[in-house]
């Protein structure tokens, strides 16, 4: 049991040699191979679904724990299967970005195909078990089966063919907003609320800017490898403009939801992130530099990625404020139900 590696793998995606890998316990190997450091995005989605349920006095702790665990296992399954799919298709070679900024256990010879699929089957089974419990909790409701089916669809087909059809970025918006948070709210409350769906978009768009930024960063190599991400399809300049739009749009969405009195003005604490937005926007107005800027970090969280780390840094600021604003909004709704009605 290597607790130090557990902690490290939850913070970054650690590079390890084959000798180091052989000495690791199974949990450490699972955390590294599933890229556990990024699973926090899914935990936040589950937390947001829970906060919306608390806001409406419909929260139940045990179903929420099953929801959070199931979503995290589903995301982990997706990461494992993505690596397997790309490896089989010959995409993740040593000259590809995925193998540059983090370990790809199959490419690096740390895992065999069979071991990867074993991890995938076990992890996906845990996700399915959580889904079945939630289906039982909701009396095997038809809409819940549809949500489970959509989740399975995106796990299996995100890398191929959706990403190949320039639909990967659209899938991220759907999954991290309406499906995880809106669907999670439905699982907890048995109520589909379109206001909740709209309210999920600021977070979902933030996650998408990071994915979009990464796809812009590797646009040239994706083009050569015939990987048709949306930036490859629409071009680098328009892709950068779309990221800018996705960074700005959440402010207008939240102002609209305050104006319609779904949110209280407390959610507008996100406006504190505007100075950070002004810092990163100039970079998105210009093409990616040919070489690493002198003051830009290298390696994990840095070069050769450029737009992705910038989007991540901004999204971390905005996302933190959004969660804090939602917590404040929930508290004021519970303590002063008549406020801003």
Model-identified regions with their sequence ranges:
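Topogenic membrane-insertion module of multi-pass membrane proteins
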Residues: 1-62, 66, 70, 165-168
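Membrane-embedded alpha-helical segments that form the functional core of polytopic membrane enzymes
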Residues: 44-48, 56-84, 145-156, 195-213
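Intramembrane alpha-helical segments
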Residues: 102-192
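Extended hydrophobic alpha-helices typical of membrane-associated regions
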Residues: 259-335
């Amino acid at each position: 049991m290597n607790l130090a590696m557990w902690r490290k793998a939850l913070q970054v995606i650690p590079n390890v040699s084959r000798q180091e890998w052989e000495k690791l316990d199974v949990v450490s190997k699972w955390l590294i191979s599933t890229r556990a450091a990024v699973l926090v995005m899914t935990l936040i989605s589950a937390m947001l679904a829970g906060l919306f349920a608390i806001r409406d006095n419909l929260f139940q702790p045990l179903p929420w724990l099953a929801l959070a665990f199931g979503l995290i296992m589903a995301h982990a399954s997706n990461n494992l299967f993505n690596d397997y799919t790309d490896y089989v298709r010959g995409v993740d070679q040593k000259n590809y970005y995925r193998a540059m900024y983090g370990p790809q256990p199959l490419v690096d010879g740390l895992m065999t195909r069979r071991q990867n699929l074993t991890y995938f089957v076990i992890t996906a089974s845990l996700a399915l078990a959580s889904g079945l419990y939630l289906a039982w909790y909701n009396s095997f409701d038809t809409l819940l089966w549809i949500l489970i089916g959509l989740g399975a669809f995106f796990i299996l087909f995100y890398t191929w063919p959706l990403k190949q059809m320039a639909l990967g970025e659209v899938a991220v918006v759907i999954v991290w907003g309406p499906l995880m948070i809106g669907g999670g709210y439905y699982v907890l409350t048995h109520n589909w609320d379109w206001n909740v769906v709209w309210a999920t978009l600021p977070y979902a768009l933030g996650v998408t800017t990071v994915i979009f930024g990464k796809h812009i960063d590797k646009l040239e190599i994706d083009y050569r490898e015939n990987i048709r991400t949306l930036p490859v399809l629409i071009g680098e300049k328009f892709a950068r403009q779309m990221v800018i739009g996705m960074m700005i749009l959440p402010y207008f969405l939240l102002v609209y939801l305050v104006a319609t009195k779904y949110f209280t003005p407390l959610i507008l604490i996100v406006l504190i992130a505007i100075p950070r937005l002004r810092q990163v926007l100039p970079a998105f107005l210009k093409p990616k530099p040919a070489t690493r800027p002198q003051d830009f970090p290298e390696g994990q969280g840095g070069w050769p990625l450029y737009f992705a780390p910038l989007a991540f840094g901004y999204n971390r600021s905005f996302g933190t404020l959004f969660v804090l604003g939602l917590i404040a909004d929930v508290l004021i709704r519970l303590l002063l139900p008549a406020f801003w009605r």
